[in-house]
């Protein structure tokens, strides 16, 4: 039995008594249930259920509280005392949450005090008149600095109180007068559970206004990224608000931003890791801030160029390199007939690797940096067609000669050692079995056997594992080797055939006359130790078979002999495979799924040279 008295009925008091709402600390509660929250910040926050003996409610553990909870491995029955917290009411959804920043453990593994306690959300749903009203918990400071009457009203969702944690106090102290008028939050703290907040942030990226037209009508949107010392968050405005905020916001300047709506981020449209993004609308308030202290100009998570070979295709990375070569710009035409300008540059770094970076449209035309310049590239996309390369996207940023320590160090290395160095390229080159000799030597040395990959359980780490094998293709599945994809530019979603013979894409909300077939090919490979099933997606399958999926699908229907000839031509041929292993769970069954990240035919001269070198080393040992 528990010898500790819980703060019985305290949750009801917090949300019905103004004095308790303003100071909701010191309560003693029991852990009622636990579960990890979803999202990119799940390692920082835990959503749990706590009980005061009469009611139970949700608690979101943040910062120190989240770290403590995980390190102590707290579980149902443990009793805690809350040290720092603030309540929040999400009025639209009738949710009541306690945001806990710190607590202490009072008793472990206590018996449950009341397993039939009332869920607080349900109680207040039945007794809505008992809770504090907006005017009771929204002081004048929280609605100050409004510029017109339409913005002066209380927002739809009731605000949390303005108790600040340590990180938030650091931001508020940058402006001594702001603490009474606005709670300054760190960007990493933003979530739908905070409803009165202001961030002080720099516009680290500003996109152009984009327009669209479909069956539902016309529209336009505008994107910016906001940056502070804790992280970055994407913001989007639509239609008239896109025009309004495009005129207000300038890249590089610092602003106070408040009253924007928080919604889950869409990873396919952003290179940031924040689990939420801002929607700038009629209620959003943005004021320029002339105190830029403690607001960084940019934030990077650099990786070395040699690590790009292990990155997922279509992932976004930050890189720092020296511009080694600059190619002339040229023109490309898409399947839809749209023309694009492109320029390729090559960057190198002190990992000994080089990689191609594709610039597009106006950036490709205007590029004028000299060779030997330092380039910091943020949010550049990893591609894999004929080897790994990088491609600038709509929100990628290239900063020339940035004034950061890493850039000075890299420039010093290049001037003293790197200018005349030989670099390994990740781009495949004709005539060398797909790669340079130096690159092939490195890949040959990295090989392991299939049996070793299976014995070491590669793929069970959180992000999966990469490994290389030399193996022969023993079988190719010719059924369901491709899927019908949308034929619109930059859309690969599966389409469904309609009764009228057209193919519909729900994402684009369009019907097209024919699909664009894309590979999802399954093969079996063998080496001297074991067998493995692999999946190849479109780029890798085209490289293996030498034809695209549209062509092979036509041959299957119109020329079965040629179809068989192509599919059998690769069987029992040896290749070098770069494989990504990752654990998959389906119907509560876990298994390792293997996909091909890269492949190339064997270069027997390089193989012989490598074996000769290894024999020489063994003889000299």
Swiss-Prot record:
Localization per record: Nucleus
UniProt superkingdom: Eukaryota
PTM annotation: The N-terminus is blocked.
Residues modified as N-acetylserine: 2
Cellular compartments per GO CC: chromosome, telomeric region; condensed nuclear chromosome; cytoplasm; cytosol; DNA replication factor A complex; nucleus
Chain intervals annotated as zinc finger (C4-type): 486-508
InterPro entries: Euk_RPA1_DBD_C (IPR047192), NA-bd_OB-fold (IPR012340), NA-bd_OB_tRNA (IPR004365), Rep_factor-A_C (IPR013955), Rep_factor-A_N (IPR007199), REPA_OB_2 (IPR031657), Rfa1 (IPR004591)
Main localization category: nucleus
GO molecular function, a single term: mRNA binding
Modified residues annotated as Phosphoserine in this record: 178
Subunit structure: Component of the heterotrimeric canonical replication protein A complex (RPA). Interacts with POB3.
Purpose of the protein: As part of the replication protein A (RPA/RP-A), a single-stranded DNA-binding heterotrimeric complex, may play an essential role in DNA replication, recombination and repair. Binds and stabilizes single-stranded DNA intermediates, preventing complementary DNA reannealing and recruiting different proteins involved in DNA metabolism. Binds to single-stranded sequences participating in DNA replication in addition to those mediating transcriptional repression (URS1) and activation (CAR1). Stimulates the activity of a cognate strand exchange protein (SEP1).
Comment field (misc): Present with 4100 molecules/cell in log phase SD medium.
Protein name per the record: Replication factor A protein 1
Organism: Saccharomyces cerevisiae (strain ATCC 204508 / S288c)
Source lineage: Eukaryota, Fungi, Dikarya, Ascomycota, Saccharomycotina
């Amino acid at each position: 039995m528990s010898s500790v008295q819980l703060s019985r009925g305290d949750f009801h008091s917090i949300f019905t008594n103004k004095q308790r709402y303003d100071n909701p600390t010191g309560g003693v509660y029991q852990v009622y249930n636990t579960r990890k929250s979803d999202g990119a910040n799940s390692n920082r926050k835990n959503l749990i259920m706590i009980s005061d003996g009469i009611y139970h409610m949700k608690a979101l553990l943040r910062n120190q509280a989240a770290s403590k909870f995980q390190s102590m491995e707290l579980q149902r029955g443990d009793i805690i005392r809350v040290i720092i917290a603030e309540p929040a009411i999400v009025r639209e959804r009738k949710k009541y949450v306690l945001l806990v920043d710190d607590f202490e453990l009072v008793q472990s593994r206590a018996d449950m005090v009341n397993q039939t306690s009332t869920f607080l959300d349900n109680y207040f749903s039945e007794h809505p008149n008992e809770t504090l009203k907006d005017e009771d918990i929204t002081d004048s400071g929280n609605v100050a600095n409004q510029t017109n009457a339409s913005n002066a009203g209380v927002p739809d969702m009731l605000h949390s109180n303005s108790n600040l944690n340590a990180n938030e106090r650091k931001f508020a102290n940058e402006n001594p007068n702001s603490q009474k008028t606005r709670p300054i939050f760190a960007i990493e703290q933003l979530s739908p559970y905070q409803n009165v907040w202001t961030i002080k942030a720099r516009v680290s990226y500003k996109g152009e206004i984009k327009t669209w037209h479909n069956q539902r009508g016309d529209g336009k949107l505008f994107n910016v990224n906001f940056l502070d010392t804790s992280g970055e968050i994407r913001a989007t405005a639509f239609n008239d608000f896109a025009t309004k905020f495009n005129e207000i916001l300038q890249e590089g300047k610092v602003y106070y931003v408040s009253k924007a709506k928080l919604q889950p981020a869409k990873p396919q449209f952003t290179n940031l890791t924040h689990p939420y993004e801002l929607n700038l609308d009629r209620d959003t308030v943005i004021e320029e801030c002339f105190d830029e202290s403690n607001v960084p100009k940019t934030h990077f998570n650099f990786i070395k160029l040699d690590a790009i070979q292990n990155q997922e295709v279509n992932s976004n990375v930050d890189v720092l390199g020296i511009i080694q070569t600059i190619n002339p710009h040229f023109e490309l035409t898409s399947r839809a007939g749209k023309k694009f300008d492109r320029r390729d540059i090559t960057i190198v770094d002190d990992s000994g690797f080089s990689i191609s970076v594709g610039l597009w449209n106006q950036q490709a035309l205007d590029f004028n940096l000299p060779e030997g310049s330092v380039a910091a590239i943020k949010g550049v996309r990893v591609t894999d067609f004929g080897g790994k390369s990088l491609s600038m996207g709509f929100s990628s940023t290239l900063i020339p000669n940035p004034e950061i320590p890493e850039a000075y160090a890299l420039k010093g290395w290049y001037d003293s050692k790197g200018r005349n160095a030989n670099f390994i390229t990740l781009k495949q080159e004709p005539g060398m079995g797909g790669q340079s000799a130096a690159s092939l030597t490195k890949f040959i040395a990295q090989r392991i056997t299939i049996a070793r990959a299976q014995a070491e359980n590669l793929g069970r780490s959180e992000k999966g594992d990469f490994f290389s094998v030399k193996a022969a293709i023993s079988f190719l599945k010719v059924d369901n080797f491709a899927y019908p994809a949308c034929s619109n530019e930059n859309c690969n979603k599966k389409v469904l055939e309609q009764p009228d013979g057209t193919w519909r894409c729900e994402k684009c909300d369009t019907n097209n006359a024919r699909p664009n077939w894309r590979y999802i090919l399954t093969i079996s490979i063998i080496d001297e130790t074991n067998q493995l099933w692999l999946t190849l997606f479109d780029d890798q399958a085209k490289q293996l078979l030498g034809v695209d999926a549209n062509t092979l699908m036509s041959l299957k229907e119109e020329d079965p002999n040629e179809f068989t000839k192509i599919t059998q031509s690769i069987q029992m041929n040896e290749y070098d495979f770069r494989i990504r292993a990752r654990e998959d769970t389906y119907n509560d069954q876990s298994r390792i799924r293997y996909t091909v990240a890269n492949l190339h035919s064997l270069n027997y001269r390089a193989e012989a040279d490598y074996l000769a070198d290894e024999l020489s080393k063994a003889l000299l040992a």
